[in-house]
């Protein structure tokens, strides 16, 4: 009887593991932003709110507005992609056409204004790397302005 129970549990876990391994994209941004917000000492929810404004879309899995990791903004137009690979390919195509000012990822970091933010385009679309840079940048703004609200207001309209 115990053997049968163990087999049933093992089969159930094996069947569930692909679903568990494939976390929905909005959750990747939320978790990365929350962790980097705490690590940088940013008031809880502030970086998350900026992320929702910058790359928010209705998450198909939850119905909530959440930062979306596979987002780009080029010439004022936001584009949401289903995969990281699609987003990277779109940025490469835009760059090949001469466009340089492109916002990428959960926190919509501008590649022209922040040319040294990421070692590669792939890294720019990594939710943790993207959120980490955004947290550092917001913290730098706060250090000079001494005001979180003003710093948040300057997040997208200020260069490093």
PLM region descriptions:
Residues 22-160:
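Catalytic glycan-binding domains that act on GlcNAc-containing polysaccharides
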Residues 16-18:
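N-terminal signal peptide c-region/cleavage motif recognized by signal peptidases
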Residues 2-10:
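Sec-dependent signal peptide recognition
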């Amino acid at each position: 009887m115990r053997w049968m129970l163990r087999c049933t549990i093992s089969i159930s876990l094996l069947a569930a593991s692909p679903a568990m391994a494939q976390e929905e994209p909005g959750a990747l941004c939320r978790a990365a932003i929350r962790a980097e917000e705490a690590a940088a000492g940013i008031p809880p929810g502030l970086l998350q709110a900026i992320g929702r404004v910058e790359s928010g879309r209705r998450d198909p899995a939850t119905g909530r507005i959440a930062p979306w990791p596979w987002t780009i903004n080029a010439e004022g137009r936001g584009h949401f992609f289903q995969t990281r690979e699609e987003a990277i390919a779109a940025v490469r195509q835009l760059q090949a056409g001469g466009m340089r000012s492109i916002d990428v990822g959960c926190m919509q970091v501008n590649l022209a204004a922040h040319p040294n933010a990421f070692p590669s385009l792939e890294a720019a679309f990594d939710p943790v790397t993207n959120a980490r840079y955004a947290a550092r940048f917001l913290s730098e703004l706060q250090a000079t302005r001494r005001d979180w609200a003003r710093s948040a207001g300057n997040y997208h309209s200020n260069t490093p």
